[in-house]
Curated annotation (Swiss-Prot):
GO process annotations (BP): translation
Organism the protein comes from: Salmonella typhimurium (strain LT2 / SGSC1412 / ATCC 700720)
Source domain of life: Bacteria
PANTHER family, sorted: LARGE RIBOSOMAL SUBUNIT PROTEIN BL19M, RIBOSOMAL PROTEIN L19
GO MF annotations in UniProt: structural constituent of ribosome
Protein's name according to its UniProt entry: Large ribosomal subunit protein bL19
Phylogenetic placement of the source organism: Bacteria, Pseudomonadati, Pseudomonadota, Gammaproteobacteria, Enterobacterales
This protein's UniProt keywords: Ribonucleoprotein, Ribosomal protein
Keyword Transmembrane helix: no
A Gene Ontology term for the protein's cellular component: cytosolic large ribosomal subunit
Family to which this protein belongs: Belongs to the bacterial ribosomal protein bL19 family.
Amino acid sequence: MSNIIKQLEQEQMKQNVPSFRPGDTVEVKVWVVEGTKKRLQAFEGVVIAIRNRGLHSAFTVRKISNGEGVERVFQTHSPVVDSIAVKRRGAVRKAKLYYLRERTGKAARIKERLN
């Protein structure tokens, strides 16, 4: 029984997901429906958490919009997510960067990973 579930989940998973880690700056393009129109909307920010669960994987992106912190959780293999592009690699030592929620301005900066 579990082999059938694994096979179905494997078929639904996206193959073109780039590798990214917490601390990386990514641009996620998401399909948005407004009335009858469907368009792409970009959300660019720092990845503060990744949850690896196969088909149910998700990641959290945080950005500052008009001086207000905005976080959004994306399902990695969702059909709503059109593309994920890594803009900048960040050098961090933790898997979850929730401490960035309390930091503002220069204190919230992340060093760039050079490799």
